[in-house]
């Protein structure tokens, strides 16, 4: 089977329902927690580490759910949602490779926020660079990531870790 190298929103929502890669595969979260509208490129090689990369985008609109509650009178996208998007994309990479299991964020080394996403922004862009993939009894990916708003880097994270687990009862 030939792998796709880009995904639209409908395909990403199909992943949330278990329809894109099958019921046993990892799933993206559904709306409103799916934090990107499309994956513009995904490769199992490339990136600075040569281990793979994912590029994705989120269209910013003033009516996005988080602007109405974070904060009243001072709307800003919560930084943790951008970080979660980076974990979502790292886990999606493992699922796209064909690894089975449910995705779980396992941590990260360093996170920096140097800007914010406001309702008048137009586009958030994510760059995920895979630095390590383990596909044995433990299935895990490690990545370095950046988030841009309107082409300005505002978040960075190093050593993001996501695992896929076939059994999560004792996790």
From Swiss-Prot:
Recorded coiled-coil stretches: none
Family: Belongs to the thioester dehydratase family. FabA subfamily.
Function comment: Necessary for the introduction of cis unsaturation into fatty acids. Catalyzes the dehydration of (3R)-3-hydroxydecanoyl-ACP to E-(2)-decenoyl-ACP and then its isomerization to Z-(3)-decenoyl-ACP. Can catalyze the dehydratase reaction for beta-hydroxyacyl-ACPs with saturated chain lengths up to 16:0, being most active on intermediate chain length.
Keyword Lipid metabolism: yes
Localization in the cell: Cytoplasm
NCBIfam families the UniProt entry points to: fabA (TIGR01749), PRK05174.1 (NF003509)
Protein name: 3-hydroxydecanoyl-[acyl-carrier-protein] dehydratase
Cited SUPFAM superfamilies: Thioesterase/thiol ester dehydrase-isomerase
Example GO BP: unsaturated fatty acid biosynthetic process
Documented EC number(s): 4.2.1.59, 5.3.3.14
Any one Gene Ontology molecular-function term assigned to this protein's record: trans-2-decenoyl-acyl-carrier-protein isomerase activity
GO CC, alphabetical: cytoplasm
Reaction equations catalysed: a (3R)-hydroxyacyl-[ACP] = a (2E)-enoyl-[ACP] + H2O; (3R)-hydroxydecanoyl-[ACP] = (2E)-decenoyl-[ACP] + H2O; (2E)-decenoyl-[ACP] = (3Z)-decenoyl-[ACP]
Positions of disulphide bridges: none
Subunit relationships: Homodimer.
Highest rank taxon of the organism: Bacteria
Pathway: Lipid metabolism; fatty acid biosynthesis
Gene: fabA
Active-site residues, Swiss-Prot/TrEMBL: 70
Keyword terms: Cytoplasm, Fatty acid biosynthesis, Fatty acid metabolism, Isomerase, Lipid biosynthesis, Lipid metabolism, Lyase
